[in-house]
């Protein structure tokens, strides 16, 4: 092997260095909630390279924002708490889900953990709940329903001029993808903010590692493989009285028509 070629040992050594560098990324990336206040929050972007976001610890204070949550299960609840932790002046004002028990679980969590109360008349159930949440005077929505439903929900939010946090995956089939892309162009034309839940793309250690790679730390990358080894996320036993549809939706991660299966639903993080 020529000296300029990258050996396995050199590669492992370099990736260990990158891992160590990633641990100090929070100190390297500017924050809009602390420090000397000189940061202009300019995204880190190089000519010809793809967008690399700046990752502040907390959002800049501004006017109060009213937020609606569409899909109040585990991911919707988690994203809602994440949002409240990440910024001041956030008020969750509307909740929507096919199932009332999901809404009540999130209401209780908001009440107990964040001292926020969502009024009865602002809680909506059924397959049209997303429309009622979006029409309830919110500034932005968290869209965390099963992936198959997200294109239609995002399309409606965009039509109504509402900003969106859209969980990944954004779609599970070509039709859904085309719906998303058409709505995205409309959102851009309207000046709406749209963020997707691709966590690797927004994780400080990964961002810092990418910066080191782009700087040439491990040399030219000519190829690679992406792996994700994992067992079952979870499984919902069918309960007496559940219809086929209710069982599918409550157990959505295990049904390809709703989740897109492992590559689309989970492995998309690492592919991204």
Please identify what each model-predicted range represents.
Residues 2-162, 179-191:
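N-terminal glycine-/serine-/threonine-rich beta1-alpha1-beta2 phosphate-ribose binding loop
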Residues 68, 141-142, 172, 198, ...:
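A generic structural signal for short
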Residues 71, 76, 190-196, 200-272:
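Predominantly a Rossmann-like dinucleotide-binding segment in NAD(P)-dependent oxidoreductases
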Residues 99, 125-127, 146-150, 171-173, ...:
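Short, solvent-exposed turn/loop segments enriched in Gly/Ser/Thr/Pro and often Arg
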Residues 161-173:
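ADP-ribose/adenylate-binding Rossmann-like module
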Residues 175-177:
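Rossmann-like NAD(P) dinucleotide-binding subdomain of oxidoreductase/dehydrogenase enzymes
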């Amino acid at each position: 092997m020529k000296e300029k070629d990258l050996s396995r040992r050199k590669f492992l050594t370099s990736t260990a260095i990158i891992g160590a560098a990633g641990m100090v990324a929070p100190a390297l990336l500017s924050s809009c909630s602390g420090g000397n206040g000189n940061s202009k929050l300019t995204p880190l972007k190089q000519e010809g390279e793809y967008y690399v976001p700046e990752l502040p610890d907390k959002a800049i204070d501004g006017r109060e924002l009213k937020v609606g949550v569409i899909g109040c299960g585990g991911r919707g609840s988690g994203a809602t708490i994440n949002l409240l932790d990440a910024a001041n002046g956030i008020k969750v004002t509307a909740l929507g889900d096919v199932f009332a028990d999901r809404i009540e679980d999130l209401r209780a969590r908001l009440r107990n953990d964040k001292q926020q109360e969502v009024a009865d008349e602002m809680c909506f159930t059924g397959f049209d709940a997303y429309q009622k949440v979006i029409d309830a005077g919110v500034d932005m929505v968290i869209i965390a329903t099963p992936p198959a439903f997200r294109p239609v929900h995002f399309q409606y939010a965009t039509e109504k001029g509402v900003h969106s946090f859209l969980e990944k995956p954004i779609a599970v089939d070509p039709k859904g993808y085309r719906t998303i892309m058409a709505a995205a162009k409309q959102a851009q034309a309207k000046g709406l903010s749209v963020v997707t839940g691709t966590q690797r793309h927004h994780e400080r250690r990964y961002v810092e590692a990418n910066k080191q790679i782009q700087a040439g730390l491990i040399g030219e990358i000519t190829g690679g493989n992406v792996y994700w080894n994992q067992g079952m996320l979870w499984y919902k036993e069918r309960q007496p009285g559940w219809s086929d549809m209710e069982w599918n939706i409550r157990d959505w991660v295990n049904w390809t028509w709703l989740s897109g299966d492992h590559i689309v639903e989970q492995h998309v993080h690492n592919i991204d």
